Amino acid sequence: FILRETQTGEIIDDVANGRSELGILYLFEHNEDVLTKLFKKNDLVFEEIFKASPHVFISKNHPLANNDIITLEELKPYPYLVYEQGKRNSFYFSEEFLSVLDMPKNIQVRDRATLFNLAIGLNGFTVSSGVIDKELNGEDIISKKLDMDCTMRIGLIKKKNIILSRYAISYIDSIKKHTAIV
């Protein structure tokens, strides 16, 4: 069993080429058409696991941490932390739900540890599904609802007509169980 966290394009390539059985991605209005075409071209299927409204991940000590809901205007003074997408530096492949945001301060990172360290050290933020596990990530990063009227569909991709291994099935079951209680 290998768990890799990588760029969106690599996830699609890895599943298409058989390096990975599964990939976890999200679809929303700005990337769905492009990614769906890629799935079809690579003989992949997308299976929705859950829907989520956008949230921000911030430090528990962030100046906005006591807000129940955070607006884009309130976030403008703080660094927007986004994952680098390498050669496919297109917002269609962005890891962040709202990569289309035009924020005055942007920092690209390659991994979650760096992103969380900068969120804590610089009062930065990133936009995501809101799903965060305190057992895995600690209690320094919290999730707050972002005041936006849109939805993301989080799901998995796999090769069409593939028989999944017991590890893949167990992983899917764990994800579904965890996201059902979040």
Describe each region flagged by the PLM.
Residues 1-33, 109:
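Central regulatory/effector-binding core of bacterial HTH transcription factors
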Residues 38-80:
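Flexible hinge/capping segments at coil-to-helix
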Residues 40-47, 52-53, 113-162:
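Beta-alpha-beta core module
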Residues 27-28, 60, 87, 128-132, ...:
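Short secondary-structure boundary segments
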Residues 32-33, 64-65, 72, 76-100, ...:
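Secondary-structure junction motif
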Residues 1-3, 97-107, 140-141:
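A local structural motif
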Residues 12, 16, 46, 72, ...:
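Short hydrophobic/charged patches on amphipathic alpha-helices used for structural packing
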Residues 8, 90-92, 111-113:
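Conserved glycosyltransferase catalytic-site signature
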